[in-house]
A protein has these predicted regions:
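Cationic, histidine-enriched alpha-helical/coil surfaces that engage anionic ligands
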Residues: 1-295, 300-317, 323-327
Length: 327
């Protein structure tokens, strides 16, 4: 849970990209990153144990494709390694180090430097950070579409996951402006980050299998058994990648500027209406979330988002122009 909160804080720093100067943002991002890494050791082993269970079940309750006895033996060795690593708990020194890092960061907050000299109100405070996160995720997704899923490296998939997770954290911070619509985006982003998170863990398990030393007494059957195990894991990974890629197509269907323009309009409507207690009228962006009654589609095909698409032309450009004039 601590690591999740640290990631959320890093997403918040990225969201303030338009006004918090790069040096300040970079310094604090490194602090939060290093704090998370300090806490990651035993958690990483526990995550891989959970991934093993998703793939093959437990020793007592195996599941999935029936493993050859050689494959089952290899998985048993990997499981023992991970159980030993996961048993190591965080030391008092590590916890104290993280506490000191965060306390030091908190004392610096009053001295943070903002690019404009003041904290501006309005959605453009957040637009640059949102657009940057969305754009990076979209760029990496489009690379996969261009080169083909089978040619994408593990590092590229991991980057797509990181950007989807970051955008999800950022939209959670903004979800009050239109809960039903933004929850649909958040759910889709979670599906991408969870699916590619499993893929990443499965890749690490494959690496551990490859790192197991061969014995001089290993037979050809034992070597083939290891290869069959790797192929079994790879089939699961391909299904996860295909599912995540399909979700990413829905998330990144818009150009970054259009995505931010639409979110800016949502912000303005929320700020000028619902948040101030003004009468809740049906606007060009669709019904109030309380009236929607169902989850919206992140693609814009749902009722509310499709209405927003149809009306963020002149009205949306006017809203955005006003916001930019403030920034």
């Amino acid at each position: 849970e601590i690591r999740k909160e640290l990631k959320s804080l890093r997403a918040l720093l990225q969201l303030a990209r338009g006004h918090l100067v790069k040096a300040t943002r970079g310094q604090e991002n490194v602090v939060l990153r290093d704090a998370g890494r300090t806490l990651s050791g035993s958690r990483d082993a526990a995550a891989l144990l959970a991934a093993l269970e998703k793939l093959f079940g437990t020793q007592e309750h195996p599941k999935g494709e029936a493993l050859h006895p050689i494959g089952a033996q290899i998985i048993g060795r990997i499981r023992q390694q991970l159980q030993s690593e996961a048993a190591r708990s965080l030391t008092h020194r590590e916890l104290r180090t993280v506490s000191e890092m965060l306390s030091s960061m908190r004392t610096r907050i009053p001295d943070w430097v903002f690019a404009t000299g003041v904290i501006q109100r309005g959605s453009m405070l957040l637009a640059a950070g949102l657009e940057h996160t969305y754009r990076r995720g979209r760029q990496h997704y489009r690379i996969v579409e261009t080169i083909g899923m089978e040619n994408a490296t593990d590092e590229l998939w991991h980057e797509i996951r990181k950007q989807a997770k970051a955008l999800g954290y950022q939209l959670r911070l903004l979800r009050k402006i239109w809960p039903s619509a933004l929850h649909a985006w958040i759910d889709a982003l979670d599906e991408v980050s969870d699916g590619l998170g499993d893929d990443h863990d499965f890749a690490l398990i494959q690496q551990r299998i490859l790192q197991l030393p061969f014995e001089t007494t290993d037979t050809e059957q034992q070597v083939n058994g290891r290869q069959a195990l790797l192929r079994t894991i790879d089939r699961r990974r391909q299904r996860l990648k295909l599912f995540s890629l399909n979700r990413a197509r829905m998330i990144y269907v818009e150009k970054p500027a259009r995505f931010v323009e639409r979110l800016s309009v949502y912000w303005e409507l929320w700020r000028d209406g619902g948040r101030t207690g003004a009468p809740r009228k049906r606007t060009a962006a669709g019904p109030h979330p309380d009236e929607a009654g169902h989850k919206q589609s992140p693609t814009g095909n749902g009722p509310a988002l499709s209405r927003a698409r149809g009306t963020t032309g002149a009205a949306g450009r006017e809203q955005t122009a006003n916001l930019k004039s403030r920034g």
